[in-house]
């Protein structure tokens, strides 16, 4: 995969004394106390005027643990990484202000048309920012007393792990490079566990967290791979009444080849082909078996390598350690090999179109939605 980068952090006390105003994006996604992570290297700061210091971004900023990055880069096996704890790392912007307050703006666009704003309070020394994209250039702007300071930084390429209160096994399926040199877009499909606590009461998205989740992700569809039998009567997505929802009773692993699951798969891929259903949250109960199977087929038809497909599946080992080493997908790959095609992508597409009933137009729509 990609070149290795170090985690960075501004937690050195000596440096804090220098940051008199806005280390206007002391964006050290990897370091900070949210996950009990040790601080590491320091970005040097530059004083731009009296009372104002800004970071100089000499390296990319890491949004995951060192071990998770090593897994991504092919330097460490996932089974050796899962014991190190959660792979997610927030971005922490540390600062000191000699004014009462300031504003930090972050955007992927240099015009700041879609900027997210964060208040900087003189009584605090940091603001934590969750769920930025990996492998992405960000523009930042800090405003204090009518003066603006701006710059850019880039996040390191890695798996994009997601943090949502009360929910686990979350990640963006985007960011992967395909075998033909394209990239799966981030921000379109987040995979995870159930949100309603029906099977596991610990997995529950609380009412007070819904607005923040929607501000970040803007989900319009809840693709629920569970059976409708888990609940009685009308069902509403925890993501909000305005969010579309459907149960699919999806298969797991080699069940995808059983005739009784063909209609379920056909409906799933028909909805994955609908551009109006994105951004989408895709899940089952644990975000493991049914979700892992559907994501494998989806990323496979997008031409992700078999090695990366297995890595994406086994990242669930951070929540369920046994998944980091299990071989349940081997039967899936073996049976897909019986279908016409010189590549795994061709075999998956032929299976979906000739057996499941997914149309070629739907395949092309999915590829158009996800690839850049």
What name fits each language-model region?
Residues 286, 290-291:
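Ser/Thr-glycine-rich phosphate-binding loops at phosphate-binding pockets of nucleotides
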Residues 27-31:
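C-terminal motif of bacterial Sec signal peptides marking the signal peptidase cleavage site
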Residues 33-281, 293-372:
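Cys-dependent protein tyrosine phosphatase-like superfamily
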Residues 20-24:
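Sec-dependent N-terminal signal peptides
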Residues 3-18:
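Bacterial N-terminal signal peptides that target proteins for export
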């Amino acid at each position: 995969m990609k070149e290795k980068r170090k985690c960075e952090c501004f937690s050195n006390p000596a440096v804090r004394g220098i940051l008199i105003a806005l280390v206007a994006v002391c964006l050290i996604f990897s370091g900070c106390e949210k996950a009990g992570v040790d601080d590491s290297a320091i970005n040097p700061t530059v004083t731009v005027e009296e009372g104002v210091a800004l970071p100089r971004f000499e390296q990319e900023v890491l949004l995951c643990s060192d071990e998770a990055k090593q897994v991504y880069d092919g330097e460490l096996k996932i089974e050796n990484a899962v014991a190190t704890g959660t792979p997610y790392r927030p971005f922490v912007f540390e600062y000191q202000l000699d004014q009462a307050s300031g504003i930090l703006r972050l955007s992927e666009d240099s015009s700041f048309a879609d900027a997210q704003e964060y208040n900087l309070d003189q009584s605090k020394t940091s603001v934590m920012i969750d769920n930025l994209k990996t492998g992405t250039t960000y523009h930042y702007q800090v405003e204090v007393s009518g003066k603006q300071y701006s710059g850019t930084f880039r996040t390191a390429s890695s798996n994009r792990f997601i943090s949502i209160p009360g929910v686990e096994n979350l990640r963006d399926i985007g960011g992967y490079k395909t075998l033909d040199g394209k990239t799966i877009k981030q921000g379109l499909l987040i995979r995870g566990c159930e949100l309603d606590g029906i099977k596991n009461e610990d997995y529950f998205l609380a009412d007070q967290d819904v607005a923040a989740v929607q501000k970040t992700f803007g989900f319009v569809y809840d693709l629920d791979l569970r059976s409708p039998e888990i609940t009685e009567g009308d069902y509403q997505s925890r993501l909000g009444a305005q969010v579309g929802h459907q149960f699919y009773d999806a298969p797991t692993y080699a069940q995808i080849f059983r005739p009784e699951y063909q209609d379920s798969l056909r409906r799933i891929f028909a909805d994955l082909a609908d551009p109006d259903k994105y951004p989408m949250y895709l899940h089952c109960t644990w975000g493991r078996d049914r979700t892992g199977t559907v994501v494998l087929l989806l990323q496979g038809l997008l031409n992700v390598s078999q090695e990366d497909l297995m890595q994406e599946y086994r990242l669930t080992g951070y929540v369920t350690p046994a998944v980091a080493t299990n071989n349940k997908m081997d039967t899936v790959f073996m049976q897909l090999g019986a279908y016409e095609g010189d590549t795994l992508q061709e075999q998956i597409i032929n299976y979906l179109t000739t057996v499941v009933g997914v149309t070629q137009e739907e395949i092309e729509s999915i590829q158009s939605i996800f690839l850049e």
